[in-house]
Amino acid sequence: YPAQAGQAARVTYRAAMTAEPPLPPVAFSVPGIAVENAKPAPGRYPLVVLSHGYGNVTAALSWLTENLASKGYVVAAIRHDDPDIADRAKFVGPLINRPRDIAFAAASLRKQLPDLIDPTRTALIGYSMGGYGGLTVAGAAIDPAGMLAKGVPGGELVTLARNPAALQVAGLKAVVAISPFGGNGLDIWGSDGLAGVSVPLLFIAGNRDKVVGYDKGAAGFFAATPRADRYLLTFREAGHSIGLNPAPAEMTSTLWDFDWFEDAVWRKRRINAINQHFITAFLARTLRGEAAMSAYLDVPVVNS
């Protein structure tokens, strides 16, 4: 959040991510520019709730969280309690919990910080599994007859699909979905569930994404959301790893660790800078009503 930090010491983020089995998780640190428990700057600000990918951590998204906070937003990055990605039997947990976590966090923060957050202006940003969660909360209807919904033990995903009101976020004005999960043959929203989304959308993806797909991922979702004012930013030849920080030094020893963070074609700092540019313009227009920001979104050429 915007703060009066002065010369106080800046934070260092510490986390760990899954290593290639059977190795233990790899711990790493990321230097930040935020100040822990700093006094908030006066005023009420739009809320941005950020949801990381399956097996990711919030520290790996500081390139975006701190950047947005410095531009006048209250940014809350959820630390999801994901199971080990190697345990495929527990994969269904995030499918159920991502939308619930996002809706719960947004509602709780508005109640806890009424003097800091403007409850009428909220945006969701999600990477990979977080993108699925954000789109679902925004109105994408899970198909109760779909393969994934029927395959979740106990029918919990079917129950979630039949109670969309439980996921609604008041004051929702925009969603940014980076490499969003949900398509690529899984079709969690069925043939027309995405048509329920009407808030402005910004999809960001690499067209060589082998994890969640592109034609049946972000590009397909873009085509399936006709009610929304929407944009699609594509990194040509990029894969799935376009949503995190540059790889910390501790995550460069093995290809598995490095692959969490880095793309095979694009420099990560270049990716982050481009994403910051478009996300900044998109949120300024949708959350602050700054019409002049459209000039940064409506680019003069499709391929550049």
Language-model features: locations:
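Alpha/beta-hydrolase active-site loop
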Residues: 60-63, 67, 90-120, 124, ...
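Catalytic active-site module of serine/aspartate enzymes centered on a nucleophile-bearing elbow/loop
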Residues: 250-304
